[in-house]
Design a protein with these regions (language model features):
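Extended beta-strand/beta-hairpin segments
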Residues: 1-47, 55-160
């Protein structure tokens, strides 16, 4: 499976990613020189953990026909006081009022299976390489991996 994201710089401190026909937009907060028009990349990092964990909690309940009204998750990063990096990420699962006690530990084990979280626990190696702008590799669109348009007819180029 080839997973490829195309990254664009639409202006200011905004950085956007095109993935499988979806634009993922980011910006920096105003306090950091951005316009605050979109979440920061770090916000999306935390959101990916929360939404992944949330998916596992939701599916756990759905597979057991449990009421999900009131089910919620929160993600809280705890930073290292000596540095800027996060030392712990706490995922809090708020269970619905009628949630059966016998499933309490099981839903936490399900949330623990979040693939985003698991990738952090067993961190991949990162490889950063430089290439000429003439593209040594074909773009995702050239490889047929992404849609170059949207249902409204807007093309990625018109958004830049």
């Amino acid at each position: 499976m080839v997973l490829l994201m195309e990254i664009r710089f639409p202006g200011g401190l905004r950085v956007d990613a095109l993935h499988e026909g979806f634009w993922i937009r980011t910006d920096q907060p105003v306090a950091q020189g951005g316009e605050g028009t979109a979440p920061s990349p770090f916000d999306l990092f935390l959101a990916s953990i929360g939404t992944c964990a949330g998916f596992y909690a939701l599916r756990f309940c759905q597979q057991r026909n449990l009421d999900t009204r009131g089910l919620a998750l929160s993600v809280t990063p705890e930073r290292d006081p000596a540095g800027k990096l996060v030392k712990r990420i706490r995922i809090r699962v708020a269970l619905p009022p009628a949630f059966p006690e016998r499933y309490r530990e099981a839903i936490l084990r399900a949330v623990d299976q979040c693939s985003v979280k698991r990738h952090l626990a067993e961190a991949p190696q990162f490889e950063v390489v430089a290439a000429a702008a003439s593209q040594e590799e074909p773009s995702p669109a050239e490889m047929g991996l992404v849609s170059t348009g949207t249902p409204s007819g807007v093309t990625p180029e018109s958004l830049l």
